[in-house]
Curated annotation (Swiss-Prot):
Residues 94-161, 168-183 have a biased composition (Basic and acidic residues). It is found in: Mitochondrion inner membrane. The chain crosses the membrane at residues 392-412, 503-523. GO terms for cellular component: mitochondrial inner membrane. Keywords: Coiled coil, Membrane, Mitochondrion, Mitochondrion inner membrane, Transit peptide, Transmembrane, Transmembrane helix. Residues 524 are mitochondrial matrix. The keyword Protein biosynthesis does not apply. InterPro entries: MDM33_fungi. It is a multi-pass membrane protein. Homooligomer. The keyword Mitochondrion applies. This is Sensitive to high expression protein 9 homolog, mitochondrial.
């Protein structure tokens, strides 16, 4: 009935749509009616055909996106699953799933082998560490036992008034010189009081040892030292008191140098760089620990994934044979379904821990890199500062050397020369005055030479040192005169004007600084 009503409505709609064009034809309107009908049909085709083409194109794209072999393993209906698995498509899907499972198993097996190897290495390390700890504990126990034995031996010596000592083998040796009264029973059962001096080798309970065991280790050591001469211990014993004092002084000097070096590092700022180095080493250790933690988190995450995948695989296997379940299978399915949520939570927690560990590794790595860059930058600044300080120190030393040269040449040497000359003249005058009048004729020629007569030409002993002139020829003549005066043995004094002395000192200083700069630039 509904279908009939729909068809009737469709016919009415078509009748209304094409009613103007379906009127009885007349001779006058036939051509116009045909033209309008053809126009309507063309317009409908133009507007409807693109929509159909778009719909067809979308359907083709949707069909091309579909996989050739759908994943029928996700179908939960057992009957439909059984029908599909009986066909070729279901078999191919199962084979694909089996190949993926085999690949996962291989990867998990490789990961498991690698983890087993790492665990074996860790186990060996733990065994080695435990062995070392047991050996150290054994050594400590032996030391405690020896200490206890020594205390006990001291008490016995104090009690028995004897002198016992312990041998290398752990036994006691000594000499009991105490005089005691000993009761001896003879065959006639007579008691005799005897006094004896006993020399024994005994334990703390006065039990006699087999023999007096010598200290073999010391004897062997002495024999080796006698056979092989020049050992360090022998040299140390044979050193004189002066050599020992010298060694002690050198050790103290070494400590002083270390203290001075530490103070210099504090002043220059290198101690902070040393602290930065130690912090970098600490960060490297932290990075190693963080990487070890990431490795452990990866192992835990892999185990969680393996546990959950194994549980899901077992659930899928139970679902494949759902139609013939037993009571044990039902209980197992219930248990697996109940544990699946816990496995998922464990997997999420392991993944979260792994992400946190990896982020921590990234943070530590970034901090370590930044610390290394900071250390490099600070060391560069420190080296530049030291280089700059050494350059200024070199210039200061050069200036001091030039100043000392100028002072020694132009102040100290003339003063020393004048003092020597005056002292010599005074000495000569004293000798001349003390000579008797008998030798007056012999000393007259000498006096005449020292005090020339008025008719003689005086010998010039001083020279006015000048080299500032206005012309080139005058400068050359001044240089020649100055050179002749410097080379003449009769000239003993040089005289400078104040301006010329300042100019000469400045010239010498500039030449010295230039030579020093050239030497520093060549050997830097």
């Amino acid at each position: 009935m509904n279908l009939f009503v729909a068809l009737s409505k469709k016919k009415k709609y078509q009748h209304k749509l094409f009613a103007p064009y379906l009127r009885p034809s007349t001779d006058t309107t036939t051509t116009e009616t045909r033209f309008m009908l053809s126009t309507c049909l063309i317009r409908n085709c133009v507007f409807i055909r693109p929509r159909l083409s778009v719909i067809c194109f979308k359907a083709i794209r949707y069909q091309s996106k579909k996989s050739d072999f759908p994943d029928y393993t996700k179908i939960n209906d057992p009957k439909l699953r059984e029908i599909i698995e009986g066909s070729n498509f279901g078999t191919e899907a199962i084979l694909k799933k089996q190949r993926e499972d085999q690949d996962k198993k291989k990867k998990m097996e490789q990961e498991r082998k690698r983890l087993e190897q790492e665990r074996e290495v860790d186990r060996r390390r733990e065994e080695k560490r435990a062995k070392e700890e047991s050996e150290s504990n054994k050594t400590d126990n032996d030391n405690e036992a020896n200490q206890h034995t020594d205390d006990k031996l001291a008490k016995v010596n104090e009690k028995l008034e004897s002198n016992f000592s312990k041998t290398e083998s752990g036994k006691l040796r000594g000499e009991d010189t105490g005089t005691r009264e000993t009761v001896v029973e003879t065959e006639e059962e007579e008691e005799l009081k005897l006094k004896a001096e006993n020399k024994i080798i005994a334990t703390s309970k006065d039990s006699v040892d087999e023999s007096d065991i010598p200290n073999l280790a010391k004897e062997i050591n002495e024999t080796i030292q006698k056979e092989i001469a020049g050992l360090p211990s022998q040299k140390a014993k044979n050193q004189s008191k002066l050599a020992k004092n010298l060694t002690k002084y050198l050790d103290s000097a070494h400590d002083t140098i270390l203290t001075a070096t530490r103070a210099l590092n504090d002043v220059t700022g290198y101690s902070a760089i040393e602290k930065l180095k130690k912090s970098i080493e600490t960060q490297e250790d932290d990075l190693k620990k963080a990487k070890e933690k990431v490795k452990q988190c990866k192992i835990a995450y892999g185990e969680a994934i393996q546990r959950r995948s194994h549980s899901q695989r077992e659930v899928n296997e139970l679902l494949t044979r759902k139609h013939n379940w037993s009571s044990n299978d039902l209980e197992r399915f219930t248990e697996l379904y109940r544990n699946d949520h816990e496995n998922e939570i464990h997997e999420q927690e392991a993944e979260k821990k792994l992400d946190e560990a990896e982020s921590k590794v990234d943070g530590v790595q970034l901090k370590l890199t930044q610390s290394i860059l900071t250390r490099y930058h600070e060391e560069q600044i420190w080296s530049d500062k030291i280089r700059r300080s050494s350059t200024w120190g070199t210039w200061v030393l050069m200036g001091l050397n030039v100043l000392l040269f100028v002072v020694a040449t132009f102040i100290v040497e003339p003063w020393k020369r004048s003092k020597l000359v005056s002292a010599f003249e005074d000495k000569v005058k004293q000798v001349l005055v003390g000579i008797s009048q008998e030798n007056e004729q012999i000393l007259d020629p000498i006096i005449e030479k020292l005090e020339p007569t008025d008719g003689q030409v005086p010998i010039k002993t001083s020279f006015d040192f000048k080299f500032v002139t206005n012309t080139w020829h005058g400068l050359k003549a001044a240089l020649v005169r100055n050179y002749e005066a410097l080379m003449s043995p009769e000239i003993t004094n040089l005289e400078f004007d104040k301006f010329e002395f300042e100019l000469f000192t400045m010239t010498v200083a500039i030449v010295a600084f230039s030579m020093g700069s050239l030497i520093v630039s060549l050997f830097k």
